[in-house]
């Protein structure tokens, strides 16, 4: 047993305890019991722990620790993601910063990848070290990196199988394109930002001198304009893509333009004739009701182009500059099947069958950046009298989350997965309950995405990642296989056939979707047996955020179903998004990010300011952020310890969409830990000579571990606390099952702070100080027993302090086990219902009595050592019985000189008064306080009780409440009103005597 310090200092034991747990192998699966598995959403290997990580990992760890204590065979599968784009950016920047004159491109693919592995070896485990500081009890020996050989083999296998099943194809499609990284990116990597822009109106002349009668009507249908026009006025926010227009579009029921559908207009600056088409996509009320259609540069236009079989003209290159020439591609969707003879190897070849003409761009525009091209095109339009108007307009601008650059819809050859069949099965699994969402409303989000799914672009133009297992010959034929050797053998390709592997890699989500089973050895049977594939799949629960329900959760369900015939997990617990105390999203640019390690270990103000202002994408914000930080944290952030942060997270974990993190809550829960520490010191000091360590005081538990003897209570206070302990134990199990960590934390907090620390410790003092040695011994044992049980109840949420305290308490109960984390989680005890219920009711009455009299003492500023007299008036037999029964406790707890009863008609001296039910409590004021002050106190109390009566009357006069609330609740409210009314009458009567 280590030395027990007098004050709570988490720095003195948290790191020590974690190292001991890990060294002893306590985090590893036991191999016995019911399997309980949790998958950690693998954080980026480039990353550091942020509040979102800390939030989810705390809840996961609580579940794992709880189920481990329940005897389950727990596996928390952890690992990191190779994070293709993020890692490539970090290492590319580092290569330049090393100052050797090297760049990513100068190193070449192999040299650069070697640099990435070097970097990963040096700093790739940062986030796992930080997770340990939080208390994550994962089996680190099974930590997996998505680029490790086993998961890499799984990626190749999955790609080949899907390709052979006809689910993967290569085709020309529109994708999100980052012109800085020069790669396709996923929707999740695109942030739509509201920005101020312009809406330009451009005149598109009708072909061949055609004119039409343009008529406008107001909302009532009255004609307000009629004129002959020879052009259509098109509204657009992107004039730089005008060169790629292949139609203009109106709503088919817009009376202004219906006669023009099927006609053509002359595309400005080009002389090309493009059709006027009708499509219900158009909003007739937006702009002029006429929009340009540029299928190669807008996602909505792309779909419209497919519907109307419009040509597609790509006018921007991969750097978002105007091309010098381009091909007109037909409006047929491009994409090869799994036939290994017809999939081309590059964008030019992939659409060869769909090309029928070549366009040369205006020479003065070729090579211009898109924004320079916009400026020039607008100038050209204005010079030709075709620019009608430009008005300010707020629009959603898609920006890459890595580079901050505006993302371009870009037509390029990529690899895709056909999703329709996979999605139908994935949706059916959830609909029939094979996978359950918590809270259940998130199934609607899942359903919406699955019912509106598009084929998935899985290729990325990067070097770091899983290289696509496809090889091209010189004729553009593609061959997919697990290796080049397999490809050559399967297709009888001799050495004279030159094969070149695809340069692209698979997007990170492709490997992440295999996480539930690739981490368990799939597809290698030997590895599967070693990793417990059959035992640990499906996992029990996935804890994740709502923002990746589609990108990760849905894909895991689909992939696991297809490749294993199983579901990846039974439950999906969706957490909210952590925001700051004002409800704002935490972001570097806002300067409101909180680092969980700074909350745990503390940080000086200067270091905090430096952390928040370094590396800003907008350096001009630094001064504002520094000023706000100094105002909010004038002393920096004090260390709170891991437990205080964890308990804060649990308490905040509602089932809502957004969660406001307030550092003040962490301070409050640090105080809670301190309260628990001091209560334990009290118990230990008062049980130092106890005999609880003798063999008679403990018994063998059902699991073979030593278990403390169940108390045989000799006092009402013991019976009360044991009944409350049983109730709180049952509630803890229920809240864990419901993933209601907030209600769990609240219940345990109330029990620990109010019922155990504040009340039972106080109520135990009379017995501990009495001459009744049996009652004293029983109380000491119950103190230890309840405290030890409470520490076990709290352990999943606050593992460090509970372990440290338990190691002091356990020996007093004769427990031989060496660690709390492997002790059984408490189970509700079977109590003698009637006896315990009666004792509990009596103690609740005693608590009210003590509280009422302490309020009087506090209000009157009576010194704690000053003894007072208590006069009682009332005719309830139960009150007289309780007063007699608890006389010793009342004298001890309230510093009473004596207790006397007054007759109903007896005149009482001037007294401070309180009412408990029908019992009137009077503390004579003579020599105690100023009578005027007592009048003020009574007036205040009368107002308080009147307010409570108003609340009850309000409820009972509400027909909806009376009709819909359970009868017991309504009756309880009526009883409460009666009690308040009785109290008010007594208070007014007493006030009248002063």
Curated annotation (Swiss-Prot):
It catalyses: tRNA(Val) + L-valine + ATP = L-valyl-tRNA(Val) + AMP + diphosphate. Belongs to the class-I aminoacyl-tRNA synthetase family. ValS type 1 subfamily. Its EC number is 6.1.1.9. Residues 329-355, 692-714 are annotated as: Disordered. Residues 928-994 form a coiled coil. ATP binds at residue 588. It is found in: Cytoplasm. A motif ('KMSKS' region) lies at residues 585-589. One of its GO terms (biological process) is valyl-tRNA aminoacylation. GO terms for cellular component: cytosol. ValRS has two distinct active sites: one for aminoacylation and one for editing. The misactivated threonine is translocated from the active site to the editing site. This is Valine--tRNA ligase. Its main location: cytoplasm. GO terms for molecular function: aminoacyl-tRNA deacylase activity; ATP binding; valine-tRNA ligase activity. Residues 329-345 have a biased composition (Polar residues). PROSITE patterns: AA_TRNA_LIGASE_I (PS00178). Keywords: Aminoacyl-tRNA synthetase, ATP-binding, Coiled coil, Cytoplasm, Ligase, Nucleotide-binding, Protein biosynthesis. A motif ('HIGH' region) lies at residues 43-53.
